[in-house]
Amino acid sequence: LLDCMPALHDDSFENAMKVRYDLYETAHILFRTSYHKQVSDWCREHHLQYATEVPSMRHSTQRYSDIVGGDTAHEKLGKPLEWIYDEYIHNYRSNAKAVSSLARQLGKKYAMIESFHSVGWTMTLQDAKWMIDRLGSSGINLYNFHAFYYTIQDITKHDAPPSQFLQNPYWKYYRKLADYVGRMGVMVTNTDADIQIAVLDPVAALWTKLGNPLHGFPYRGESEREQKK
């Protein structure tokens, strides 16, 4: 292992691309087998479904999940679609379309997104519907809203707001949103996707360039020359 360490700093090192790939692949397999598979097996043994919304090394990190998930939709109404894609599409966790695609590939019924955290206390039901519509059009059919706080005392008030619970001025209207979201989920679940285009996931190439998969593949090496490339 020590003999291969220079490959992480010098892309001209012998077999540097393979060494880098093997490093990320090893971390990915260890994470998936030592954590996800064990939790998934325990859930199955106890008749529970294993739902995950986790950082992923690659698309197949959630292979052992019964419900695959992601974390996106954290903005006020009006952001251009181009901004949404630029902000979220490069990260497995925040790419709603990648989540629904993975669910389809694995034959899973549900694709889940956790949404609404950190939008702020100015978030309205109109903002919520706008984000839900976008998730539904991306194939998401299970919606996990962040969060329903039992209290907003002290620092809790500032922990990735808003609360969707009693403290929210829109709470008395929440049934309308809940009914709408329920209908959206049923519709998407019972809709067949007409997929005509396949997009190659370039994760292998990004790994060889030391792209960090947990944070949208930014370069994580120390070579200024390679970073410019």
Kindly give the residue locations of the regions a language model identified.
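Carbohydrate-binding surfaces of carbohydrate-active enzymes
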Residues: L1-K229
